[in-house]
Amino acid sequence: DTSTTYGFLEPRGIDALVTKLAKQSSTQRYAVSGSVAAQPYAPYADARLSLIYTDDPATLAAEIGLRPVAAGANVLIAVPRSPVVFERTSTWRDITVVAPSQAVADLLSGPGRNPAEGDYLLSWMKENEDVWRRQLDR
């Protein structure tokens, strides 16, 4: 069983996507995962692909001006299989990002260089548990 995922294009790139998400005023919940969610902890390289979880992909995409595409997407928006992706989120650059453990899981199963990014983030997590684990986890 997999999440239902839709491809979109943010023509100005991932930084523009982050800016748009930070400025959007929707009450719709979302959480960014993958390369973007790894940035506050262990940046591997500039993000080229973003994964966003939300309950209503079409509405979120319209609110932030994304273009639906069949190929060449730089933004994937997924309806999560479980609401766990919305738990233990944090804020980075005024956007909601998933927990590092969720970002690792998504990166390790992602396309392109995502698995290498996942390995890099996982190594960082092992060396810096006190930084990313919340007090409730201890």
Regions found by a protein language model. Give the residues of each.
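Short gly/ser-rich loop at a beta-strand->alpha-helix junction or flexible surface loop bordering the NTP-binding
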Residues: 2-81
